[in-house]
């Protein structure tokens, strides 16, 4: 069902909301907003002006219409048939990043540890959070420099690399639910694991920020570690071509890239989608790949690895929208 919004006012339960101050883009190519640089269009894409504007937009969307929150689109594929509902772009909007001065309402710091809390909104790029922490003499967040997405996405999937995960240092979550209610939640309210985070009591809501507790330490050493991690990433990953990072989760006790390479799939290509010759757990767009090319290649890798090794790889990337 199609719903048209008037920019002058938004009808919500209880009356008329303030004027929406953001921008609607109609039939917006999502290839402009995902790191694969491929895929279909969003029927409606909204760029909110700020958090308050986002809240009112969510309250205005009919209950039967899907909402998709997107940051940098670094682990997202939108099928060529496009995506219905409303896509909301958070990167460049929810950008607050600051040392937290308040103590009320936050879990107490562990005894005998000198720590500080950083608040980062969902639209902040993960590498920016890593650099901010290091600049303020805080350690433990360096690995975030290796995550090519936003804080919101990192929290949602418990992103990690180099032996650390996003939820290792989270002490409180800032969320927005489908009713447009802002909440502050504790990590104990979630089930988390490898590339997974979900409320114990399922409820449709999105992460709009998080509070990270980090230890005070040697900021210069932290900045050097970030530089070292980035050098490793540049040397081992195909960053010169459009990609979405790791396509598959590592199975227990093994590596997805090793299994894919062992099956002779490095360099395998469907259309302009190719299994990277540099890192087998990356699929790159070597020209004008379509979302269909990429999805077919993902499925081919899954089927081939399972046939050869009896291991079914689990996807780390998210695919939304309609097939063409």
Curated annotation (Swiss-Prot):
GO biological process entries: cell division; cell wall organization; peptidoglycan biosynthetic process; regulation of cell shape
Species in which this protein is naturally found: Thiobacillus denitrificans (strain ATCC 25259 / T1)
UniProt keywords, alphabetically: Cell cycle, Cell division, Cell shape, Cell wall biogenesis/degradation, Cytoplasm, FAD, Flavoprotein, NADP, Oxidoreductase, Peptidoglycan synthesis
Reaction equation(s) it catalyzes: UDP-N-acetyl-alpha-D-muramate + NADP(+) = UDP-N-acetyl-3-O-(1-carboxyvinyl)-alpha-D-glucosamine + NADPH + H(+)
Main location class: cytoplasm
Gene: murB
The protein, known as: UDP-N-acetylenolpyruvoylglucosamine reductase
This enzyme's EC code(s): 1.3.1.98
Similarity section: Belongs to the MurB family.
Cofactor: FAD
Role according to the record: Cell wall formation.
Domain FAD-binding PCMH-type: 38-231
Protein location: Cytoplasm
Cellular component GO terms held in the UniProt record: cytosol
Active site: 195, 246 (proton donor), 316
Superkingdom of origin organism: Bacteria
PROSITE patterns (UniProt xref): FAD_PCMH (PS51387)
Pathway annotation from the record: Cell wall biogenesis; peptidoglycan biosynthesis
MF terms (GO), sorted A to Z: FAD binding; UDP-N-acetylmuramate dehydrogenase activity
SUPFAM superfamilies: FAD-binding/transporter-associated domain-like (SSF56176), Uridine diphospho-N-Acetylenolpyruvylglucosamine reductase, MurB, C-terminal domain (SSF56194)
Primary enzyme class: oxidoreductase
């Amino acid at each position: 069902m199609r719903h048209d919004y008037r920019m002058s006012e938004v009808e919500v339960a209880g009356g008329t909301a303030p004027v929406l101050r953001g921008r609607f883009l109609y039939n917006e190519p999502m290839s402009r907003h995902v790191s694969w640089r491929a895929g279909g269009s969003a029927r409606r894409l909204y760029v909110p002006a700020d958090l308050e504007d986002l809240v009112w937009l969510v309250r205005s969307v009919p209950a039967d219409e899907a909402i998709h929150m997107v940051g940098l689109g670094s682990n997202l594929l939108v099928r060529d048939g496009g995506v219905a509902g409303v896509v909301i772009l958070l990167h460049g909007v929810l950008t607050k990043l600051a040392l937290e001065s308040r103590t009320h309402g936050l879990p107490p710091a562990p005894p005998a540890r000198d720590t500080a809390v950083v608040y980062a909104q969902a639209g902040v790029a993960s590498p920016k959070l890593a650099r901010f922490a290091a600049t303020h003499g805080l350690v433990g967040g360096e690995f975030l420099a290796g995550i090519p997405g936003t804080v919101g996405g990192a929290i949602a999937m418990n992103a990690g690399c180099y032996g650390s995960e996003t939820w290792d240092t989270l002490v409180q979550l800032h969320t927005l639910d489908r009713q447009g209610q802002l909440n502050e939640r504790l990590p104990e309210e979630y089930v988390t694991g490898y590339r997974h985070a979900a409320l114990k009591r399922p409820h449709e809501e999105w992460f709009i920020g998080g509070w990270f507790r980090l230890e005070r330490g040697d900021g210069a050493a932290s900045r050097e570690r970030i530089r070292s991690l980035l050098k490793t990433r540049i040397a081992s990953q195909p960053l010169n071509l459009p990609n979405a990072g790791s396509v598959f989760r590592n199975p227990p006790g093994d590596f997805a890239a090793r299994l894919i390479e062992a099956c002779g799939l490095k360099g395998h290509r469907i259309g302009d989608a190719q299994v990277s010759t540099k890192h087998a757990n990356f699929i790159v767009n070597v020209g004008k790949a379509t979302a269909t090319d990429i999805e077919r290649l993902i499925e081919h890798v899954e089927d081939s690895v399972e046939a050869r090794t009896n291991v079914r790889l689990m996807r780390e990337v998210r695919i939304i929208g309609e097939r063409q």
